[in-house]
Structure formats: C-alpha cells, structure tokens
Amino acid sequence: QFPTDYDEGEDDRPKSGLGAR
C-alpha cells in the first residue's frame, strides 16, 4: 500500500507527506 508513515487507527490517513493525495 503506502509507506509506513501512517497513523494506524486513523482511517489510514497519512500523517506525513508520504502517500498523501
């Protein structure tokens, strides 16, 4: 999927600029 820069438990929303639409 996307880089491991996501907040697990936040609807798979990127907290960084890695994979952010």
UniProtKB/Swiss-Prot annotation:
Signal peptide feature range: none
Q: Which UniProt keywords apply?
A: Adaptive immunity, Blood coagulation, Coiled coil, Disulfide bond, Glycoprotein, Hemostasis, Immunity, Innate immunity, Pyrrolidone carboxylic acid, Secreted, Sulfation
Name a GO CC annotation attached to this entry: extracellular region
- Skewed-composition ranges (Acidic residues): 1-11
* PTM summary: Conversion of fibrinogen to fibrin is triggered by thrombin, which cleaves fibrinopeptides A and B from alpha and beta chains, and thus exposes the N-terminal polymerization sites responsible for the formation of the soft clot.
- State which residues carry a glycan (glycosylated): 4
Q: Where in or outside the cell?
A: Secreted
Q: PTM Sulfotyrosine: list the residues.
A: 6
Quick one: a GO biological-process term for this protein?
A: adaptive immune response
Q: Where are the annotated segments for Disordered? A: 1-21
Answer yes or no on keyword Disulfide bond. yes
Q: Which residues carry this modification: Pyrrolidone carboxylic acid?
A: 1
Domains as described in the record: A long coiled coil structure formed by 3 polypeptide chains connects the central nodule to the C-terminal domains (distal nodules). The long C-terminal ends of the alpha chains fold back, contributing a fourth strand to the coiled coil structure.
User: What exactly does this protein do?
Assistant: Cleaved by the protease thrombin to yield monomers which, together with fibrinogen alpha (FGA) and fibrinogen gamma (FGG), polymerize to form an insoluble fibrin matrix. Fibrin has a major function in hemostasis as one of the primary components of blood clots. In addition, functions during the early stages of wound repair to stabilize the lesion and guide cell migration during re-epithelialization. Was originally thought to be essential for platelet aggregation, based on in vitro studies using anticoagulated blood.
Please give the subunit comment from the record: Heterohexamer; disulfide linked. Contains 2 sets of 3 non-identical chains (alpha, beta and gamma). The 2 heterotrimers are in head to head conformation with the N-termini in a small central domain.
Recorded protein name is Fibrinogen beta chain
- Tell me the gene name: FGB
